[in-house]
Amino acid sequence: MRICNLLNRNRIKHWITQIFALALLVAATSAQDGQPPVAAPVRPPLPPLPAPMALPKPGPTNDAPYVPQPILPGGVVVPLYPPGSPLLKMERIREAEQYNMSQAVPGRISSIVNIHNPSIEVHTVDGGLNTGAAIILAAGGGHNTLNVGGESADFVPFFYNYGVNTIILRNRLRRDGYSPKIDAVNDALQAIRLVRAYAREWRIDPNKIGIMGFSAGAELSSPAAILFDEFDRTNSAPADPLSGVSSRPDFVGIIYPGPTPFVRGASPPIPRNAPPAFITCAGAGDRVHAIWANEYFAAMLQAGIPNVEMHIYGNGRHPGDTLSDGSRMTSGLTDRNAIPFGTWQYRFIDWFRDLGFLQKPGIETKASKEITAFLSQPPPGSGRGGGGNRGATNSQANPVGAAPKAATPANP
């Protein structure tokens, strides 16, 4: 024990000696330079940061119907219905939308509620890049909010890179007293008609207009694929400025969908010119939405509709789900920690390019040609073959590849 204590004392003395020697060396060096030891400089404080600029905000309210403001710079906002439309609630038309802003990113609108004057916000592409294709984005949110941040606004620059024009749909919500199956679906179909009516002004190919819905938004895009005839017949009054303009989408995107028209074995009639569809969802981690996705796919496959593609990923969760660490699953374009489900948007681009939607405007797409070929086949039950198309009807409100009837644009 005595030996250990002696060794420890010797070590301490050695360290003290070394420190003292180093201090003498520093002092000697400073004396040789004729300068006192230099202290660390004291910097002045940084100037305060400026406040964020050009933050989006709801439009003013007055005696006129509320006019929505753009979510992103440069957006052209057009109300879906003219003032006085019977499809609007006149007692609420003047109410302002309410924005839920991101707490971390200044100016980022995460979601919107209190939508009573539904609208589209159009973002076009420069002429040299423009393919003429246009995608209407229907965000999710459980019909309680409209998650326009991750499931609409983020896609504008993404699709711009591929020459695709982007339209953000602000549809009405169940939380504000509207029916998702009636009012919101009407908003989606009206949006398709409105974009088609203004196609020339926005340099959009009228035969390359589709809709992509996310979660609750897919409860708009999936019925839009089969209900366009009924909507056009119902809204064909001569006084309607969009009468004669087809609401048929040229393609649909069904992304981690809510219930489709084929939920629990339902079998509504499927028009034989139903559009091609791209469907994606996580699998076991989002089982119920994957089942709904598969119901839509199976119905279209049974009907023989061309170019319906589905990707069900083994790993992934539904956007908004709470994880074990307390974080929430993100939506839209996020790469989801580099799992394959985080690349679904590139699989959509592969499908979209394969069907000819990324060609220059005015060139008939492969999708259109293959639907035309399908329509030339005998319908099911005709006694001339063509079996396996259970549920398909002969509806052709807007023959594929034909330009829609011209209409006087609405006066928003």
Residue ranges with predicted function:
Residues 279-281:
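Short beta-strand/loop motif that positions the catalytic acidic residue
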Residues 301-412:
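C-terminal catalytic histidine-bearing segment of alpha/beta-hydrolase fold enzymes
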